[in-house]
């Protein structure tokens, strides 16, 4: 009888250990910020805007797609310099500290090691997601694809409506 109990205990313990998969770290979860990622987003920040964000090797671009702002785009390079575009006109912005788009760009270039993150695995609306929280930011990342679903911080909500991450081979 003792052998059966011991066997059952080890079987349950083994089952429990194999069922628990480790959570990925923030570096892995933030890999959607790599070059080649394109997203259709809805930004809610005092107003609601629709845009596409494209992340390349040296810069990120936000191209507005809503009727009111269609054709206007902002591009920020890796040094933090922002240019505004409309059709073929490029306007470098000397002081971009007060621009709201700088806050939006920051949400797509979050450093993984600077913050203490709490990572929780949840099921929301039938989708397995990682909910990642630090002092200011909450990220909802699709567990299957590794792409963000929603980003929230200090009055800004970015809903990712569609996302694509290009593979290394194109």
Where are these predicted regions, by residue range?
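Sec-dependent bacterial lipoprotein signal peptides
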Residues: 1-19
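Small/flexible residues
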Residues: 5-7, 44, 77
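Gly/Pro-enriched, hydrophobic low-complexity segments
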Residues: 61-66, 117-170
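Flexible, processing/modification-adjacent segments and terminal tails
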Residues: 25-33, 84-135
């Amino acid at each position: 009888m003792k052998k059966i109990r011991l066997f059952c205990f080890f079987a349950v313990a083994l089952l429990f250990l194999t069922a628990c998969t480790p959570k990925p770290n923030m570096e892995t979860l933030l890999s959607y910020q790599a070059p080649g990622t394109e997203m259709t987003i809805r930004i809610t920040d005092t107003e609601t805007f629709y845009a596409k964000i494209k992340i390349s090797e040296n810069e990120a671009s936000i191209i507005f797609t809503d009727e009111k702002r269609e054709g206007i785009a902002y591009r920020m390079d890796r040094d933090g310099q922002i240019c505004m575009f409309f059709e073929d006109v490029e306007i470098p912005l000397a002081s971009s500290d007060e621009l709201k788009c700088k806050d939006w760009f920051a949400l797509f270039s979050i450093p993984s090691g600077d913050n203490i993150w709490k990572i929780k695995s949840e099921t929301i609306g039938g989708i397995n997601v990682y909910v990642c929280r630090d002092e200011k930011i909450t990220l909802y990342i699709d567990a299957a694809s590794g792409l963000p679903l929603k980003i929230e911080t200090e009055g800004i909500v970015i809903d990712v409506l569609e996302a694509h991450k290009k593979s290394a081979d194109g």
